[in-house]
């Protein structure tokens, strides 16, 4: 329960999402870029502001990333601006029982590798356009 909810008397029950990491929710601070991944909805704040859940969308033409198997890894690539004002903040690989984050920074290329631990989803967050997702290919 957040302090704001407690003071307002607005207490909401958190629905259990059965602990499946693929059903998790991403929250991103619009000020500093801090990221929270939660298995259910929550009330999070950062830098004095409320963090809102991000809705993952299918990649558009500017955010269409490729997922390629190289040995025992998923190799994710995307040709995207990586300037201080417009960049990919993180790429994550989620399966039913785990999640792995790769934090990216301006002027760094978007080429993370993730050890394959099962079928899952790749999530990619653009600081200007939001969260995008795609299923990993079948092994």
Predicted regions and their residues:
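Exposed aromatic-hydrophobic patches
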Residues: 77-78, 110-117
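Short metal-binding segments enriched for Cys and/or His
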Residues: 52-65
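Structural beta-strand segments of beta-rich domains
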Residues: 72-76
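Short cysteine-rich clusters marking metal-coordination/redox-active sites
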Residues: 29-32, 46, 126
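Cysteine-rich micro-motifs
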Residues: 40-51
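Cys/His-rich microdomains that often coordinate metals
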Residues: 36, 50-51, 130
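Residues immediately within or flanking Cys/His clusters that coordinate Zn2+
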Residues: 26, 43, 123
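Edge beta-strands of extracellular beta-sandwich domains
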Residues: 128-139
